[in-house]
Every structure is written in C-alpha cells, then in structure tokens.
C-alpha cells in the first residue's frame, strides 16, 4: 500500500466508473489538484452518501495507488454549501468556478491562495444571491493564482501607464494596451472603457466596485476572452452561465 494523506479538499468533478465506483477530481489545499478512485461509491449509499457532489468541501483520507491516481478511503463533509444548490443562478456560478479552477491548475501543484479563494466564493454563493462582480473578482483571483494575471495598471506591451486616452485590452498580449500601443493589438483586442478598467483595477486591489449593468457585461466579455485565450477553449459551464445570466442579481 502506498502513502496515505489526510486532506481538506473541494470536489471539482465526480464521474461514474463502471457500475459501482466513481473517480473524483479534488482540489486540496495541501497537494493541489488530484484524482481519486472511490470504490463502491455508486453501489453503497452508506459508504460515501452525498459527500462526493461537486463543490462540496470535505476532509478526505486517501491512499496513493500509483501514478497520478489516489484511492479515496474515507470522506466527511466540512461544508456542503447546501443553500446555493436550490438556485439555478448560484449553481451556474459555482459550476463555472470549479471548472475554471480545474482547468487552470496542473495536477499536484498546491495553490493555497486559489483554494482559499474558491472556498470563500462558494461561501458567498451559499450565503446570498449570485452577483456578477463577485464572479469577476474570483476570475481575477484565479488568474493571478495561476500566474496569468492580466496587466491592468501598465501597458502589457511597453509597461507604461495607459494614460487617460482610449485604451484597448488584448488578451493575447496579456492585458491593457496604452494609446500608443493600441494599434499593435491582435484580432481579439477590443476597446476597454475607463469605467470598466477602473472597476477591474479595484477588484484586483481587493476593493469594492460600483458599476452598472453595461460595465458588468463589458467586464464579463473581457475576462472571458482572457480566460479562453489561456485555456485554448470555452468552458462548458460558461455556456450554461451565459444562459442564466439574466437571473444574476
């Protein structure tokens, strides 16, 4: 038998395996993302019950099976975030947050800041309605934790402050472009309004945001494009999130 470990983890995904078992993707504070084989999880309600549902915070006992796979020996719910599960908009946001986390990080690389940020965001959803700017904050925090933080205070190309003139955001170059460098933007570059740039800077500093629906839609599109450039694809949960967007408070 391999090494054993006791971890605090969020369930990112749970996939049925055969008629009796499941493979779960966990994001742990101590060891980062890992896959665990839950023997008998489907055939016995007594063994794991509802513990392995996505975006559940649990304490897990695991045994290394070899390669990148662990065996899940026992698990107990630390926080189930049950309140958010009765609201479609909050489910959509939580699903997006866990999929974004799963896609941004590599296996077995601890990201304590991202883990704490994910748990904090799930707690926000559990305690109140889904708010668009809370999700924008989580996106920025997730990008920062993964080493992909967009440049918002200095031009992504020349490093100088963007100034007060018209600015563009180029996800391929990694952030905002000043007026002088705006012409170097690629196909995905787009204008970014002063209000949205200020709002995103405030979120990046950890401050609050006062902005309207128009600014929110622009910020969503800009960060969405940034994430898609880094991942090379559009997340499945983002499509669901866009469908329920009008339901967000």
List each language-model region with its residue ranges:
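Non-catalytic alpha-helical scaffolds and adjoining flexible linkers that form interface surfaces
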Residues: 1-249
């Amino acid at each position: 038998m391999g090494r054993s470990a006791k971890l605090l983890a969020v369930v990112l995904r749970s996939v049925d395996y055969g008629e009796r078992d499941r493979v779960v993707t966990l994001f742990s504070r101590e060891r980062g993302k890992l896959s665990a084989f839950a023997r008998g999880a489907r055939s016995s309600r007594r063994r794991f019950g509802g513990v392995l549902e996505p975006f559940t915070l649990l304490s897990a006992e695991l045994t290394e099976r070899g390669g990148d796979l662990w065996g899940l020996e026992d698990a107990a719910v630390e926080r189930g975030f049950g309140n958010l599960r009765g609201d479609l908009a909050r489910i959509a946001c939580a699903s997006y947050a866990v999929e974004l986390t799963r896609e941004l990080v590599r296996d077995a690389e601890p990201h304590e800041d991202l883990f704490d940020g994910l748990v904090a965001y799930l707690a926000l959803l559990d305690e109140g309605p889904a708010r668009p700017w809370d999700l924008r904050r989580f996106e920025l925090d997730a990008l920062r934790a993964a080493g992909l933080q967009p440049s918002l205070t200095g031009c992504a190309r020349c490093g100088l402050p963007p100034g007060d003139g018209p600015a563009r955001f180029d996800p391929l170059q990694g952030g905002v472009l000043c007026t002088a460098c705006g012409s170097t933007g690629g196909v995905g570059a787009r204008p970014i309004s002063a209000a949205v740039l200020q709002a995103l800077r405030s979120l990046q500093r950890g401050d609050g945001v006062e902005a309207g629906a128009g600014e929110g839609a622009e910020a969503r599109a800009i960060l969405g494009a940034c994430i898609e450039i880094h991942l090379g694809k559009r997340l499945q949960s983002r499509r669901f999130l866009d469908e329920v967007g009008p339901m967000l408070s």
